[in-house]
Amino acid sequence: MADEAQAPPAEGAPPAEGEAPPPAEGAEGAVEGGEAAPPAEPAEPIKHSYTLFYFNVKALAEPLRYLFAYGNQEYEDVRVTRDEWPALKPTMPMGQMPVLEVDGKRVHQSISMARFLAKTVGLCGATPWEDLQIDIVVDTINDFRLKIAVVSYEPEDEIKEKKLVTLNAEVIPFYLEKLEQTVKDNDGHLALGKLTWADVYFAGITDYMNYMVKRDLLEPYPALRGVVDAVNALEPIKAWIEKRPVTEV
């Protein structure tokens, strides 16, 4: 008796027990003969060209330099002199610095640049909510810096003296007490209970704030001091601090 013809399995039906499923059409790694092709080599990470433009001071650019150091990222640290600045100013996006050039494209806004670099070195949050926690702290630190700067750069001595009273008696204690408690609530960090770019930003900007008020702001705040000390002790940042140009600001 002739063998009974067997109907082909319906489209999409599972293979019979012990039968290997055929590779999907166009499936990666499928080759004639059923042998899998070796996995593709991982793509080389894209390397970008970075140039940072600022004056020969720490100030607003130092958090960016800290982030470059943390990520062992090569960049050109262009330190513009006061004499060079008038000719260079019209070439900058908003006629100010710091400016970061990425693959030939110039961008401004130091906080935005720091956030961008933090993403490239793995110091951001894992979710939008975590990123929000970091952003809140960084924006608070920047608000504090701006309140100090308004007083520090006041040109009228009499007005400046009055502003200093409020700054020292109210503004500085308010912000630093809040930030001190934030660190205590986050296991020695400014956000998420771990190292993030909020810690690095704060450590990088502290010298500038101390310069503006002409004293060590963190002396009465051991938790905040601990954040700065821990960041400055990280090997790549420690190496940067040891080799960076010595500047007043």
Swiss-Prot record:
Homodimer. The keyword Transferase applies. CDD domains: GST_C_Sigma_like, GST_N_Sigma_like. It catalyses: RX + glutathione = an S-substituted glutathione + a halide anion + H(+). Glutathione binds at Y54, W85, K89, Q96, M97, Q109, S110. This is Glutathione S-transferase S1. The gene is GstS1. Residues 1-42 are annotated as: Disordered. Keywords: Detoxification, Transferase. One of its GO terms (cellular component) is cytoplasm. Conjugation of reduced glutathione to a wide number of exogenous and endogenous hydrophobic electrophiles. May be involved in the detoxification of metabolites produced during cellular division and morphogenesis. InterPro entries: Glutathione-S-Trfase_C-like, Glutathione-S-Trfase_C_sf, Glutathione_S-Trfase, Glutathione_S-Trfase_N, GST_C, GST_superfamily, Thioredoxin-like_sf. It comes from the Eukaryota. The lineage of its organism: Eukaryota, Metazoa, Ecdysozoa, Arthropoda, Hexapoda. One of its GO terms (biological process) is glutathione metabolic process. One of its GO terms (molecular function) is glutathione peroxidase activity. Pfam families: GST_C_3, GST_N. Its EC number is 2.5.1.18. Residues 48-125 form the GST N-terminal domain.
